[in-house]
A protein has these predicted regions:
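A short, surface-exposed alpha-helical micro-motif characterized by mixed small hydrophobic
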Residues: 214-216
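Conserved ABC ATPase "signature" region
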Residues: 76, 123-142
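Catalytic Walker B motif of ABC-type/P-loop ATPase nucleotide-binding domains
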Residues: 172-175
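Helix-to-loop junction immediately C-terminal to a conserved catalytic motif
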Residues: 60
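Conserved ABC ATPase signature
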Residues: 147-151, 155
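Conserved catalytic motifs of ABC-family nucleotide-binding domains
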Residues: 168
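The feature captures the beta-strand-to-loop junction immediately N-terminal to the Walker
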Residues: 45-47
Length: 231
């Protein structure tokens, strides 16, 4: 294990088998298979165009696949009914590469978006829970009322992570979480991810080009190439 932090459990959270994804005549993934184990930080690395983000979006149901199967928590998300899909979605959180915060909403309101979509909570309880997430990711309380345009790159990443944690997920998907951060900020973010994994019992699926992140934070590394997982 590169990070040497913790041995993952044997339970498989994500099981992908013989997955193929094609856009027009361009086949991006071909016969890809993968297991993600509970409790691990799994890092994905590969040259540009090898399909790291495509695989992530396919797992999340944002890209259609042309072959194979993907089970999340034992459920085939693509073919599941609405209730089963909703149950799966409530158990994951996603941090997209550039944060993807809503520019017209404050940090607090951004964190509350998943709560409004999936839960039936009072405004007071949503405020309290959102403030807890802000503290959890190391932001100061006054960040709650700031808009994304008022945040530094590191603060945007942390605010987006707080939103990803809004529903107390079992797994978080991180797409290039340290891109745009200086080495100190990236190292701090890696430390935060490891701490959250240990304290919250998270499973972490991380796409990254950051070699320091791979060796500092990840328990296991998957190398994508030739349209599948090589290692």
């Amino acid at each position: 294990m590169p990070g040497g932090r913790r041995a993952p459990d044997d339970e498989i959270i994500i099981r992908a088998r013989d997955v193929s994804v094609q856009f027009g005549s361009n086949k991006v993934l071909d016969g890809l298979s993968l297991d993600v184990k509970r409790g691990e930080i799994l890092g994905f690395v590969g040259a540009s165009g090898t399909g790291k983000s495509v695989l992530l979006r396919t797992i999340l149901g944002l890209n259609p696949k042309q072959g194979g199967s993907i089970e999340i928590f034992g459920i085939d998300y693509e073919s599941a009914g609405d209730d089963a899909r909703l149950a799966v979605e409530r158990r994951w959180g996603v941090l997209f590469q550039h944060g993807a915060l809503f520019s017209s909403l404050t940090v607090l309101e951004n964190i509350q978006v998943p709560m409004r979509e999936y839960l039936d909570l009072s405004p007071g309880l949503m405020h309290e829970l959102a403030m807890l997430k802000i503290d959890l990711v190391g932001l100061q309380p006054d960040a709650a009322e700031k808009f994304p345009s008022e945040l530094s790159g590191g603060m945007i990443k942390r605010a987006a992570l707080a939103r990803a944690l809004a529903l107390d997920p079992d797994i978080v998907f991180l797409d290039e979480p340290t891109s745009g951060l200086d080495p100190v900020g990236a190292a701090d973010f890696d430390e935060l991810i490891m701490t959250l994994r240990d304290t919250l019992g998270l499973t972490v699926y991380m796409v990254t080009h950051d070699l320091d992140s791979l060796f500092q934070a990840c328990d296991r590394i998957a190398v994508l190439g030739q349209k599948r997982v090589l290692v």
